[in-house]
Amino acid sequence: MQAEDARYLKRKVKGGSIDVHPTEKALVVNYELEATILGEMGDPMLGERKECQKIIRLRSLNSTTDIAALAREVVEKCKLIHPSKLPEVEQLLYYLQNRKETTQKAGAKKGELTGKLKDPPPYEGTELNEVANINDIEDYIELLYEDNPEKVRGTALILQLARNPDNLEELQSNETVLGALARVLREEWKHSVELATNIVYIFFCFSSFSQFHSIVAHFKIGALVMGVVEHELKKHLSWNEELLKKKKTAEENPASKRDFEKSTKKYHGLLKKQEQLLRVSFYLLLNLSEDPKVELKMKNKNIIRLLIKTLERDNAELLILVVSFLKKLGIYVENKNEMAEQQIIERLAKLVPCDHEDLLNITLRLLLNLSFDTDLRGKMIKLGMLPKFVELLANDNHRLVVLCVLYHVSQDDKAKSMFTYTDCIPMIMKMMLESPTERLEIELVALGINLACNKHNAQLICEGNGLRLLMRRALKFRDPLLLKMIRNISQHDGPSKAQFIEYISDVARIIKESNDEELVVEALGIMANLTIPDLDYEMIINEFGLVPWIKEKLEPGAAEDDLVLEVVMLVGTVATDDSCAAMLAKSGIIQSLIELLNAKQEDDEIVCQIVYVFYQMVFHEATREVIIKLTQAPAYLIDLMHDKNSEIRKVCDNTLDIISEFDEEWARKIKLEKFRWHNSQWLEMVESQQIDDGEGGLMYGDESYSPYIQESDILDRPDLFYGQTGYEDGEMYDGQVTPEYVDEYGNVQNGEYLGRPASAMYGNRYQSEYESLRPGSRVAYLTEDGQPLDEYGNPIEVYAESVDQYGRPVTPTYQYGSQAQQGPGYPY
């Protein structure tokens, strides 16, 4: 401030009362600041008064502190306290020393939750009594070229200006001041923490507004600040190592204990200064990471490792900032994976619960983001965080985010059973039943739906009047999600399922009368789950007239697939009753199911449930004949016998096995289809080989050794059943000739088998006396004495026994081992 300007501004500070802080070990000093603008004649023209507070935190105050010495120190350092108030300060300090701290469990109390990051305070060591003036900016720049104390003072004055957003435009236009600040930071940040903190804070003020990010980037402040952070973290590590050495020395040598205490005090002082620098540095980087490209550069420079390393600190405000930064970075899977490698869950576990509401809330939100990863959810369970989450349900500040975390955890089947050993189920039941709104919070009921999938959890829910109260609320408010939770309870066998008998009429009434499709789907699911042996399904179906309703919903296109699936499942359940199954069969529902099967053949769930209905129908004698004789259900089952879905194949096989036992015609067809399927690869190979031989080996199109595979049923070829050449002597093991073989391929005279008939190619060329010399592919001609010669005139060996059409000797017995390798297999 210029000397001539000082005449026109008068500043006056008036001390006030001193109080103790309500929750912390601190004194609150109240004072009044009065600023007056004077005219040229010294007359006051404009004045303003402002009530202010200064908090003096007493971190060293404990049961052994010298109160008198501490009071003198406070009065000497704080100019706002008049020396005459020393006795009052002593009395307040004595009260703080003896005030009992509340022992309420951390995280269980409901404190103040701001939900936003606080701006870092100015560096405590550089608080000035003078007020900065934008008109004196040139003087402040000159201070940056002086010694270190003057540099600190100059940066503190510029910081005062920068903290006022109205001054940022003018400071931005002054490249000299920004360039000087960047130069000093780059050259001297290692020499003074105070200087580095002030300059980083100035650029932080610019980073708070997106339009000034280009200024910060121009001077490469982001990269410089990351270097500062990394250096400070390494320095902190060396401090800890040095302090640990002195602690060990003090334990071994009591004389050095005083030196250790002195070092500890110095360490805490340095730590406090360093954490101020780290806080403003991370805040600046967080603001700059608004640009994804800048954030990627930070990631490549290991910002995640630096942040996770900082989680070891105890400063709540610094931790809030660090966790917020990690939460922002964690939305990208690459960053999440790196956090997992850096053991982030172990670092966050110590923060749950904690006394600071904002820190606890942002930590839970980060854990919620991380809980999308299955492995990280498992790590939370291993570290014992589940009971901690459950305890936090009592805190309204965190209840919603905790419900979301618990919902993610409950998705894992192994984790569901662990909820049994916590107070989670009683707590969520209380929340559901005491909810003032008609529809429950979706996070709350979603957690209940997942937990109800576990049998032990379902039993806990049903204890006492639990199921009764849930049903009463669901029926009163027609809540489909609550009914879904009840449906999950109904799927478990045991005592809980029997409790549903009381509510069957209410559930059936919803099915028949409700227009809410979601509600009807869940009601159908409950009915389909009630597989109770003594339940009279026929009476229920008749009482509410559900058969016409079921037939209507089974018409293709009449309802959504979810509803159709539940209807089919209900039919499968009621079909377990003989009389009810007969009633459904007579009503034509089976034909409706077949039509639905044709329409929904791509939907595996619906197909599987329809096949299950057929399985139930063929189980009962009353409906078995209807299924087998009056419908084409077995044919559809044969088509589905080799479906890609293993569950469909399994149910099909079981159903077809039952059909085979009671109907010979279908048994033969089923056996034939199984044979075709089992040997399909071999049959395709034989077919392709025959076609290839036919295309290349015949001189004329009408020549043929035997009927082609494509001209007749492949299963009517006994030679394919028993080997490439059939039974070589036309006999079976018992010596009898198989009739089919004789009809097609053999001659019988006086009850004796005379062998295969001559082929079309050779049958008229040779007389019977030369039958044993049927030429093979090598024969050229015969000599006068009947000796066969090949095309080169060489004699060919004459077989003593008979040969086949290819010149190969016919084996008198069936060679099982060799033929089995050539012929088809059989699935039995």
Swiss-Prot record:
Name the GO terms of the biological process aspect: cilium organization; microtubule-based movement; microtubule-based process
| InterPro entries named among the record's database cross-references | ARM-like, ARM-type_fold, Armadillo, KAP3
Q: Which organism is it from?
A: Strongylocentrotus purpuratus
What is its biological role?
Binds to the tail domain of the KRP85/KRP95 heterodimer to form a heterotrimeric kinesin-II complex and may regulate the spindle vesicle targeting of this complex.
Subunit annotation: Heterotrimer of a 115 kDa subunit (KAP115) and two kinesin-like subunits of 95 kDa (KRP95) and 85 kDa (KRP85).
Q: Where are the ARM repeats?
A: 332-372, 373-411, 577-611
Q: Does the keyword 4Fe-4S apply?
A: no
Q: Which GO terms describe its cellular component?
A: axoneme; ciliary transition zone; kinesin II complex
Q: Which Gene3D superfamilies match?
A: Leucine-rich Repeat Variant (1.25.10.10)
Keywords associated with the record: Repeat
Protein name, as recorded: Kinesin-associated protein 3
Q: SMART domains, per this entry?
A: ARM, KAP
**Signal peptide start and end residues:** none
Query: From the UniProt record, which GO molecular function terms apply?
Result: kinesin binding
Question: Cross-referenced PROSITE patterns, in alphabetical order?
Answer: ARM_REPEAT (PS50176)
